[in-house]
Design a protein with these regions (language model features):
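Short secondary-structure junctions
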Residues: 27-32, 85-87
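Short amphipathic alpha-helices within nucleic acid-binding modules
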Residues: 21, 71-77
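Helix N-cap motif at beta-to-alpha junctions
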Residues: 14-15, 68-72
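Short coil/loop residues immediately preceding or within conserved phosphate-binding loops
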Residues: 7, 35, 106
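N-terminal beta-strand motif that seeds the catalytic metal site of vicinal oxygen chelate
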Residues: 1-17, 47, 61-64, 122-130
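Short glycine/proline-centered loop/turn elements that form peptide/ligand docking sites
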Residues: 17, 35-38
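Amphipathic alpha-helical segments
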Residues: 16-29
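Vicinal oxygen chelate
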Residues: 66, 75-130
Length: 130
């Protein structure tokens, strides 16, 4: 098998809300695709597809991880835009008051899109590749 490229996809229950969130809130380039899909361009030249699903159930796992130079700056910017970080305390993952997990691996914070899908911002660290 020869693989030419890859992309990921996830469902949403409101395409217009997803377009506003990924385009305006996160600042990504979002284009209307076929069949009501959204093509979301991500840094590095790739894209992900968000598609409408009438019986959408939010993903309980992280569907997108955005690598950022500073977790604190990213969380501050998202908070200013009205995005709330998730609070977790299970196994080795415990977030601080700002919603950032700093104990294991690179610092990471999770939040949800309007459809309830889990997304993260994760800080780059020397010697660690995501």
């Amino acid at each position: 098998m020869k693989v030419l490229n890859t992309f990921s996809s996830f469902s949403v229950d409101d395409v217009a809300a997803a377009k506003r969130f990924y385009g305006e809130t996160l600042g990504l380039d979002v284009k209307d695709g076929p069949m009501g899909f959204l093509e979301i361009e991500v840094p590095g030249g790739g894209h992900v597809t968000a598609y409408p699903k009438p019986n959408h159930e939010p993903a309980t796992f992280t569907v997108l991880n955005f690598i950022v130079p500073s977790i604190d700056d990213a969380v501050d910017e998202l908070n200013r835009k009205g995005v709330t970080m998730e609070q977790y305390d299970f196994g080795p993952i415990k977030t601080d008051a700002r919603g950032i997990a700093r104990d294991e691996g690179p610092p990471i914070a999770w939040f949800k899109d309007p459809a309830g899908n889990v997304i993260s911002v994760i800080e780059t660290m020397a010697g660690y590749t995501a």
